[in-house]
Each structure stands twice: as C-alpha cells, then as structure tokens.
Amino acid sequence: MRKSWKTIAILTMIVFVTLCFGVLFVEAQTKIVRRAVDNFVFDNKNHYLPCEKLPTGAEVSRIVQEHRDIIKLIEQVNPGFVGVDIDTAICPGKADLLISYASHRDRVAIESIIGGNTFFGVPYRLQNR
C-alpha cells in the first residue's frame, strides 16, 4: 500500500511539473496572461514585439509627420489628457508610438480612430495613466 501511495505522489508531481512547464511555454509564446492583465487590470494595450521587429526611429518620425492630422485627432479625444509620443527609449535605433490616455472611454475612441493594430504600419502601445 505504501508503495502505491508513493507512486501516486510521484506521478502527481511529474504531471504537475509538466503542466507548469507547459503553461510557462504557452505564456512565453502567446503572452496570454500578460495580455489579460494589461487589458483587464490596467486597461493598457501593448504590441509585445521584440526590438528587431520595430521600425527605425526615422521611419516612425516620417509616418507621424505624414499623418499629423490623425495624431491631432487622437490628441483631441481628451485635450490635455491624451498624448502621442515616439518612444525610442526601450530599443536603441528603433521606435514605436506610445499613446497615453486618462480613461477607458478615451481608449475606445483612440482605437476607433486608429482602426487597426498599427498606426499606418507603426506598432503602438496604449497606456492608461
């Protein structure tokens, strides 16, 4: 009887450890937990792209200048509380857009204006501040 309980305990631990590694692997690939926390807890949206996949700072600056009217429209969602910045701090030589806002209503309006997962090909992050 004792050996059977030990066997069950060992098998249970093996299954548990395997499941933990499986969950870690899935999270590393999809970032599903991080996305859920960002979205539902912090009301943020991130692109989770590695630096290699980001455009250069010059490309982002050019696209922002070409679409300055859309940037102004985004900033007018809630003047003084919505900002659009080119972020080059995280990845040297590369950039994305960081759009900050004050409420979920602002976020919904901003997403409606942008209408996709990129701003004319530039990845963006939405941060509720």
Regions found by a protein language model. Name each.
Residues 1-6:
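Short, Lys/Arg-rich N-terminal segment immediately upstream of the first membrane anchor
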Residues 8-27:
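Hydrophobic membrane-insertion alpha-helices, especially the h-region
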Residues 21-65:
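N-terminal presequence-like segments and adjacent domain-start helices
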Residues 43-51, 79-106:
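Short glycine/threonine-rich beta-strand-turn micro-motifs
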Residues 55-60, 122-129:
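Short proline/glycine- and acidic-rich turn/helix-capping motifs at secondary-structure junctions
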Residues 59-83:
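Short amphipathic alpha-helix segments
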Residues 100-104, 115, 129:
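Solvent-exposed coil/turn segments that connect beta secondary-structure elements
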Residues 107-117:
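Short amphipathic alpha-helices in soluble, non-transmembrane regions
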